[in-house]
Structures are given as structure tokens and as C-alpha cells.
Amino acid sequence: MFATNPFAALSASIPPAVIQGYVVLMIVLVAAGTLFDIVHKGSARYFFDNWRRSKAKGGKPIGGGELFSIAAQTAVVDVLASGEFCNARRRVAHLLTMYGFVLHALATAVMVFAYPTAATSTPAIWPLLWWLGGLMLLLGGYWFWFFIRVDVAAEGNTPFRVVHADLFVLSLLASVTLGLIWACLQANGSAASGIFCGLYILATTVLFAGVPWSKFAHMFFKPAAAFEKRVSKANGTADNLPTLTRDDPEQQARHSMELLRNAPMDMGLGIKREAPRHY
């Protein structure tokens, strides 16, 4: 089962060209939905306007080498390592979901386009990556949904409470869950595999066609926002936020109370000793 290309087996009932056309259509829907989201919300215009305002304030000029370094830091720390999450559990869940999605989607594309039928033998690594990516995604996604979500963990709401903002997460989990169930049933020759194949296609269509109404496009916006934030810190404008911190001697000298002048850097962080579960 873990070494079998489920899409090659599906080609016996659905022509490979139809399967490939469906995948291409989903890619087009993501691109079109993201562009619509950019225009509708004005995200790109906001970033460019913010960039121009930052330069107009006369901050420290940034050279090409420093800009490349900032881009590399953004890619490694903020994107690949999800460095924006200070909560370790939230970061691990996000990384499992993100890398699981990448592996699952990549393996799907390779198996559909490079090995579309049983006549073309599929290397065992691709079905294995498809399963591994799917299981990683489900582990991270369900962990987040039932135990880490702020409205569940900190506000005491039931994990079965669904709002519009949950469209992306729920459709993603539904797509991968139904896909793995379908592949398992198909490998075992179950008659129910056809039903789950239809449900898998439905959930996947909702996931990719619902980009304008979900958080799907945030995966493209967040790297741009992280890069702009690092640039604003480097040129000194810092998005109009204070740049002095408590470890700065000038900031410490401003306090009239001796206690605050010599206070340890971790003073006042007692609120972090216990999770906010007193709902």
C-alpha cells in the first residue's frame, strides 16, 4: 500500500488526461484566487506603499549585500523554521503541517504527471513521500485543531466550533484525510473506495477553489511581511514602533525608580509561567 501509486491505479477508471487536467485546474484556481485576494484586500499595494513610506522617512540606506542577507534570514528563520512562533508547540505543529503539505503536494504532482498509469513503474519513494507528507500534515493539523488553537486552549471553546476563518484548515484536513482513506481502501480492493474518491475530489476542490474566502493565500503574504519587517528594522524606521529596549542604557536611565533602572531583563514575565487557561 505504501509503495503503490494510487493515481496510477485510479487511471484504470478515470483517464490520466482527466486527472492531470484536474490538477492543472487546481493550480490555476490557486493562482487566480491569490491574485483576486491581492487585489481585493490591497495586500500588494499596502506592502509597496509601506516600503515607499519607509524610504521617504530617510532611514539608514541598505546596500545590496545587506538586503540579500535580510532576504536569506527571512527565508531561513521566518519561512523554513517558522521563527515567528514563540510557542514551541505551535511552531512544531506548524512545521509538521507545512512540510507535510509540501511533501504530499510534490509527490502528488510527480505521480500524476510522471507516472500516470500502471504501465509506467512508479519508484517506491514517491508513494512513500505521499503517505509520509499526508500523515505529517494530519498530525500537525489535528494537534493544532484540538489542542493548540487559542479559542480552544485559552478561551475554553469547544474544538467543534467552526467559523468562516476555519475554511482553509478544515478543507486541508478533510482533503488529506479522505485522500489517505481512499488510497487505503483502493489498495485493499474495497468497493467503498469510489465513494471516498468522490469525497476526496470534493474536499480538494473546496480547498483550492476557496482561496479567495480562506487563509490559503497567507502562505504567500507572510514571507513578504516578514521581509518588510526586517528591512524596516534594519533601516531604523521600524514601522513607527519604538526601537529602544530595556537593555538599552539610555532607556534604563529614563526611569526615576531605582528598581526599574536595575531590574533584570526577565522582570515582569511571570504571566508566561502558566498557560492562560483560567476561563
List where the protein language model places each region.
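Membrane-embedded alpha-helical bundles of multi-pass integral membrane proteins
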Residues: M1-L244, D248, H255-S256, R273, ...
